[in-house]
Regions:
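Structural transition elements
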Residues: 294-336, 356-358
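Alpha-helical secondary-structure segments
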Residues: 70-72, 76-77, 123-125, 171, ...
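Extracytoplasmic/peripheral linker and loop segments enriched in polar/acidic and small residues
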Residues: 374-387, 414-482, 504
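Surface-exposed binding/hinge segments that line
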Residues: 75, 89-150
Length: 504
């Protein structure tokens, strides 16, 4: 199902995928993954060396209830995102970038001081702390989308929890979603400014947890696209409608070191290092997934982001930070047990409950118990919604998670583990790490090479020095898609785009 469809509160890839079809911001990624003008009528007028941007909003941009989209809708939405009372998971996206966002998020300034202002209904002024190379990409993501204040306030807490409590300004409207059901429809939005380029009247979505069941629906023409893994890839790899591609999804396990001042056993670095080096990722990727995923020994995935000067891949540059090493894992683990005065430990691993997630967690359980003496792993497979919830409330010991990234820059991965990031949920906090990552968001923007070095160093601190995560793999995507389905647009990083989808 959909955890929620409010752009302010969204904190997971499922919600953002929905938001991307029914809402729109100043820019939208084009078919090649580059930001293209959307609600912005033209590129902004720049003042003060690029620190002030003035956007004209399209005259024909409207909400699905007929209201025009205005600068006030942006001003309202952005101020809500940085308001500490909202506790938006993505508030920190604006920190060090939009003027005063950092102080507002800390509660030192009022949200009204944020550097955004509607000069009139169709003119929007944005003030930045620093002109940032990734700002246009950020504007294509849900956190920076407008919201209709009158509608949102009328709905109150119900806003975005089912299709009746939403209005849209994007290519589609969401229909037939009651908040918990596993099917819904995207229906073409008649008030969308670019509706002439939206060829499809209706897209029906069904959530199918079991790949076998999904294949049956595909083979009986009830589904047009189905994602595959494991033995199904081997079975269908020669089918003319089979496709495989790499993505920018970084999949890892989080370890809970403690919260609210109460530490767990996993606050011990050696135990974390032992866990992080005890899984044969290549085995997992080749046998279980077989979908184009690759073993990953860092947080930032490979082949997508490159050094601005040398053009070298970030992942290759930073190398393997935590890789499978049975001997080293066992040694670190034994040392850690000694340090906490125990001879055995039981840990629970929380994850979603699709057939693939069950297979993965069984594989992980097997590897960890086999390679780390005295360890028992219990599995807790719950709905994806419950798994997101466990992450958000930091109510887990080990959690199978990951991050798809929002824009093509290492910052989108490393940002998550800042001390005050609402997406952190590990108990990790490191002053040097914060300094490097905040620098890369803000004041190092003017020196791309120095900024890049800061990001490389931050990842080393996160994994080599602190073993905050157990990196597993860079996600791939294998799927069958009917040959008459065209323009289903996906990107290595960022939400799919259904705007141009058509079926002949």
């Amino acid at each position: 199902g959909i955890p929620n469809a409010s752009p302010t509160l969204a904190d997971n890839s499922v919600s953002f995928r929905v938001i991307n079809q029914i809402f729109e911001g100043l820019y939208r990624l084009d078919k090649n993954g580059k930001p293209a003008l959307a609600l912005a009528a033209s590129e902004p007028e720049e003042k003060d060396g690029g620190k002030t941007l003035i956007f004209k909003i399209r005259e024909d941009a409207n909400w699905s209830n007929g209201d025009p989209v205005t600068g006030h809708d942006f001003e309202y939405a952005w101020k809500k995102v940085v308001d500490p009372k909202t506790a938006a998971a993505y508030g920190p996206q604006m920190e060090e970038i939009v003027k005063n966002a950092t102080q507002i998020l800390k509660g030192e300034m009022s949200p009204d001081e944020l550097g955004i202002k509607a000069l009139d209904d169709k003119t929007l002024q944005i003030e930045l702390e620093n002109p940032v190379p990734i700002f246009k990409e950020l504007l294509t993501t849900g956190t920076f989308f407008p919201q209709n204040q009158a509608f949102v306030e009328k709905q109150g807490d119900r806003y975005g929890t089912k299709s009746d409590t939403l209005i849209s300004n994007g290519p589609y409207k969401l229909e037939n979603w009651n908040g918990t059901n596993m099917t819904w429809d995207y229906v073409k939005n008649p008030t969308y400014w670019d509706k002439k380029n939206v060829p499809t009247e209706k897209i029906h979505v069904t959530v199918v947890k079991d790949t076998n069941a999904a294949l049956n629906l595909y083979n009986t023409n009830k589904l047009d696209r189905v994602e595959l893994d494991g033995e199904f890839v081997k079975q269908y790899k020669d089918d003319k409608n089979f496709h495989k591609e790499a993505t920018g999804r970084s999949v890892y396990m989080k370890m809970n070191q403690g919260k609210d001042g109460v530490k767990t056993d996993l606050a011990n670095l050696n135990l974390r290092r032992g866990l992080a080096m005890a899984i044969d990722k290549t085995g997992m990727v080749n046998t279980l997934l077989a979908n184009g995923s690759k073993a990953l020994n860092g947080d930032v995935p490979g082949d997508i982001m490159f050094d601005p000067e040398t053009k070298e891949d970030f992942r290759k540059q930073n190398g393997d930070l935590l890789k499978f090493d049975q001997q080293e894992a066992t040694n670190a683990w034994k040392q850690g047990l000694k340090e906490i005065g125990k001879t055995e430990l039981t840990l629970t691993l929380t994850s979603g409950d699709t057939s693939l997630q069950r297979k993965q967690t069984e594989f992980i359980q097997n590897q960890l118990e086999e390679n780390l003496p005295g360890l028992t792993i219990k599995l807790k497979n719950v709905t994806n919604q419950a798994s997101f919830q466990a992450d958000v409330t930091q109510d887990f010991e080990l959690l199978l998670g990951g991050w798809g990234g929002d824009y093509q820059d290492p910052l989108t991965y490393l940002n998550l583990f800042l001390t005050n990031s609402p997406g952190n949920h590990t108990g990790f906090s490191d002053a040097k790490y914060d300094e490097l990552v905040l620098g890369a968001k803000g004041k190092l923007s003017a020196d791309p090479e120095k900024r890049w070095q800061a990001l490389l160093e931050a990842e080393q601190i996160l994994l080599k020095d602190n073993a905050v995560l157990i990196p597993l793999y860079q996600g791939g995507r294998a799927y069958l898609q009917k040959s008459n389905l065209k323009n289903y647009t996906t990107y290595p990083i960022g939400s799919e785009n259904y705007k141009w989808i058509e079926k002949n």
